[in-house]
Amino acid sequence: MAGTLKITLKKGLAGRDQRIIATLKSLGLTKLNKTVERPDNPAVRGMIARVAHMVEVQEG
């Protein structure tokens, strides 16, 4: 699982549970359509799994 992941926030934070918002902030996603690069590791994969319905992930 070496490499990085490009994660893009595709849905807004309004009306979301505080745990979801906290997970997105820990990934660095605070605004709609913002893209961040994170290392491909189990911790990041777990956070992505929790918010999979709101983000788009590209391996790269």
From Swiss-Prot:
Annotated keywords: Ribonucleoprotein, Ribosomal protein
Gene Ontology biological process terms in this record: translation
Entry's Gene Ontology cellular component terms: cytosolic large ribosomal subunit
SUPFAM superfamilies, alphabetized: Ribosomal protein L30p/L7e (SSF55129)
Molecular function terms from GO: structural constituent of ribosome
Top-rank taxon, per record: Bacteria
Transmembrane segments: none
NCBIfam families: rpmD_bact
Subunit structure as annotated in this protein's UniProt entry: Part of the 50S ribosomal subunit.
Entries under PANTHER family matching the protein: LARGE RIBOSOMAL SUBUNIT PROTEIN UL30M, MITOCHONDRIAL RIBOSOMAL PROTEIN L30
Family: Belongs to the universal ribosomal protein uL30 family.
The name this protein goes by in its record: Large ribosomal subunit protein uL30
